[in-house]
Amino acid sequence: MRDGLNQSPLNPLPAAVWLLALPVIAAEVVFALGRAGFVGGAEGVGLRLSAMQITAFAPEMIQRMWSLGVIDWDQLYRLVTYSFVNGSLTHALFVLAFTLALGNLVGREFRPWAVIVLYLGSAAGGALVYTAAMSLLPGRPAPLIGGYPAVYGLVGAFTFLLWARLAATHANRLRAFTLIGMLLLFQLVFGVIFGNAGYGWIAEIAGFAIGFGLSFLLVDGGVARALRHIRQR
């Protein structure tokens, strides 16, 4: 009984999850200090905008490379850096909440390097799919900024784990997609109410699909081992 009392009521987060969350936290701290006048001097108020300009992903970048047949290696970092700078504090808080919660769950089944590859791969893949889609849609595409495509990759990995668990118990595997359905419904309602839906959801859905697909390759031991591990629980 005493041993149980000595245990922490909170499960420690995997180091890989902190590695993904800390850049977002650090950025928001710097932005807050800038608004308060402690960092950046007179330009401190605009630190978030400056960071967004440096890290945002613009589809035109890939479209230009494709048309010219060259790769601008100096700009490819934007495929992943856009996911660590968010448009507002509220945006960052939502991203952090999902990253910590879902990252903790996914990190129990994936190795640390796999969690990082999953997160960054979903961000980069979501950006590329967004670029391809926007080349077919009218209007000038808005730049991507914020961690939602990467977070949706974690949703995809979590969905994979639920899907594998339901498959092991011969239950309806479609139930595993309840979370993504709820998120999409919430996003639709939010976009209709505030009128700022845009096309960013394309990158987010792509991030989900990529996260789900990568899980078959990245989960420790593959699908067979994941099913055996779940049965033992």
Spans of model-derived segments:
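A detector for small-residue-rich transmembrane helices and their helix-helix packing motifs
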Residues: 1-233
